[in-house]
Amino acid sequence: EEQNISEDIEFDNLDHLCNHFMIYKKREAIATARVREKENHIFKIERVAVLVEHRNIKVGSLLINEIIKYYNETENKSSIILHSQVAVEKFYKSLNFVSYGENFLEDGILHIAMRHIN
């Protein structure tokens, strides 16, 4: 709802191909993301969301760092990528992601492609 993305885009029939990560607080999901293998062991973090009241207290950082840790320890990955909204690019840069390419529109929102650097 917050991003005003239509359900047709949000429910893309790819969930069954993804690993899903969640952070709970007292049985309430407060953060989530999914990761999908694109090709050649390239994993893309998608659908990152943190409830508004839990932002700016490192929940998002914890979620992304745990995802990176999981793929570093369990998968023969060549790269972890994501499409960051330009508004939060600085957040991902703080977690060792670097931007590449030009800004682009995805679902009507300005994004930049990013890659994690170990």
Regions found by a protein language model. Name each.
Residues 1-7:
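Helix-loop element at the rim of GNAT/NAT acetyltransferase active sites that forms part
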Residues 11-16:
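Short loop/turn motifs at secondary-structure junctions and domain boundaries
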Residues 50, 56-69:
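Conserved acetyl-CoA-binding loop-helix of GNAT-fold acetyltransferases
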Residues 22, 28-37, 41-49:
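Conserved beta-strand in the GNAT
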Residues 64, 71-84:
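Conserved GNAT acetyl-CoA-binding A-motif
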